Amino acid sequence: IDIRELNERIERQSAFVTNLTTGMDQVIVGQKHLVESLLIGLLSDGHVLLEGVPGLAKTLAIKTLASLIDAQYSRIQFTPDLLPADVIGTMVYSQKDETFQVKKGPVFANFVLADEINRAPAKVQSALLEAMQERQVTIGNETFGLPKPFLVLATQNPIEQEGTYPLPEAQVDRFMLKVVIDYPKLEEEKLIIRQNINGDKFEVKPILKADEIIEARKVVRQVYLDCLLYTS
C-alpha cells in the first residue's frame, strides 16, 4: 500500500468525522469521551455498550448520531416482559394464504438502539447474539442477512440498580467498547440548565450516507498497526 495514497484517502474519508462531531456537540453538552467512543465504534464496525445512571444523555447521544446519518434506525426498549420475537421477529400465520410468513423485528436496521438492555432477562438479551456476531438473524428455518452497515448501540444501568439483570459474558464479548458515563462537570450542568430553561432545541438533519461509512471502514482496515503496539 502506498503510504502517501493511503494518507490522502484517510483525509478524504475522515472529513465527515469533524461534521459528525460538530453535529453531536450542538445537542450533547460535554461528554467528549462518549462522543469519541461512539465515533470509534462507527468507524471500526464494533458495537458499543454505554453504562451510566439515567439522565446522562446516553440515549440522546445515540439518537443524535443516528439522526446525522441517512440510514435506517430503530429503538428497542428492553423491559422484563420483552420476548426474543419482539427483537428479531417471528413467523406469523396468514389466514388469507394459509401459510406462515416472516415478520421481521426491529433488529433489521442499520443502527439499533438497545435501550436499557439489562432491564430484560438473559433469554431476551441473547436474542441479539447472532445478529451482533454474524450480522444475520435466523427466524424459523430461514436465515436473513442484516443491512450494511449494522451497528448495535446499547445502554445499560449500573447493575446495583433495582430491576436489572447482569449481561451474560457471551453478550458482553460482542461489544467492542464498554463506556462508563459519568456526570457532567459543573459548568456543563449550568449550560444544560440554561438550555432547558430557554427551550433551546437544535434540528438534526442527515449529513452522511450509509455508503460513506462503509467506504471509511475500508480505509480504517488498511491502516498499519505494528504488533508492538498491542503486545507490549
Tell what function each PLM region has:
Residues D2-N7, T22, N110-A114, N157-P158, ...:
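Short hinge/gating elements
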Residues S94-V112:
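Conserved alpha-helical scaffold flanking the Walker A/P-loop in AAA+ ATPase domains
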Residues Y230-T231:
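Conserved small/polar residues in nucleotide/adenosyl-binding loops
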Residues A109-M132, Y165-E169, L186-K190:
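Conserved AAA+/SF3 P-loop NTPase catalytic/coupling segment centered on the Walker-B
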Residues L43-F78:
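Walker A/P-loop
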Residues E134-I207, E215-Q222:
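Canonical AAA+ ATPase core
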Residues S14-H47:
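Pre-Walker A (pre-P-loop) alpha-helix and adjacent loop at the N terminus of AAA/AAA+ ATPase modules
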Residues P84-T99, F150-L151:
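P-loop NTPase switch/communication element
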